[in-house]
């Protein structure tokens, strides 16, 4: 804190003591209050960023269980064999503690080879009501016939399992659209085509559009925690 001690000159005039500040007590109190206000603002800003991160993950978790949630069907972008590509997926799980999002697919799908060649992906979510956009970057691990797929398969409704029993692989040419309908086939054969895509998230870009101004924040995984920062929209 600034010192406010003053020394007397001869004749009654005041002079500044060596090493002392020229500011008066009122100015010093103002500086002190300003510093407190800045510290408080920083703490509030940090708390708000953490709240945004927490709400983002809780919103993703809700989307898993709520069919009508706007984040239920995200777009998933990849760097494909022939360039960038994007497709709509169904969000199957969201785990904040593990920083993990999952989806499911047919192991015969062309995108599986894309993930295996370059596992980097970008998830895109948008809520038109709150005008919140979330982009999440990470890497995909393809699970096939292991503990992860067995647990997911056991929890899957029977009707959904039929989707993996189609004889033609996804993307194969067919003569009639009806040939692409999944029959009620052998469950073991259907399971053999089932895969889980697990994506570890390392970066989140959050943007909220407003009528007068927008807000944007970024969260980067550092290996032990999320680095949080406001950025220009």
Language model features with spans:
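Coil-to-alpha-helix initiation sites in intrinsically disordered, low-complexity, charged segments
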Residues: 21-22, 51
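Ala/Thr-enriched low-complexity intrinsically disordered regions
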Residues: 4, 17, 21, 27-30, ...
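Binding-site signature for planar aromatic cofactors or substrates
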Residues: 30-233
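A generic alpha-helix propensity feature with a strong bias for hydrophobic helices
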Residues: 10, 17-21, 176, 180
């Amino acid at each position: 804190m600034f010192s406010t001690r003053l020394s007397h000159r001869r004749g009654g005039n005041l002079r500044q003591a060596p090493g002392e500040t020229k500011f008066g007590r009122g100015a010093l109190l103002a500086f002190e209050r300003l510093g407190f206000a800045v510290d408080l603002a920083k703490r509030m800003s940090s708390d708000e960023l953490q709240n945004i991160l927490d709400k983002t993950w809780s919103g993703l978790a809700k989307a898993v269980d709520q069919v009508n949630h706007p984040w239920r069907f995200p777009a998933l972008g990849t760097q494909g064999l022939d360039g960038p590509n994007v497709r709509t997926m169904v969000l199957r799980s969201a785990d904040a503690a593990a920083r993990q999002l999952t989806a499911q697919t047919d192991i015969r799908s062309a995108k599986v080879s894309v993930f295996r060649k370059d596992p980097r992906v970008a998830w895109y979510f948008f809520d038109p009501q709150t005008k919140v956009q979330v982009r999440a970057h990470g890497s995909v691990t393809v699970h096939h016939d292991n503990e992860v797929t067995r647990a997911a398969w056991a929890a899957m409704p029977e009707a959904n399992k039929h989707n993996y029993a189609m004889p033609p692989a996804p993307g194969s040419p067919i003569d009639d659209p009806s040939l692409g309908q999944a029959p009620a086939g052998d469950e073991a054969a259907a399971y053999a085509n089932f895969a889980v895509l697990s994506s570890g998230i390392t970066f989140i870009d959050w943007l909220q559009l407003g009528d007068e101004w927008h807000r944007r924040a970024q969260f980067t995984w550092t290996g032990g925690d999320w680095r949080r920062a406001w950025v220009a929209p």
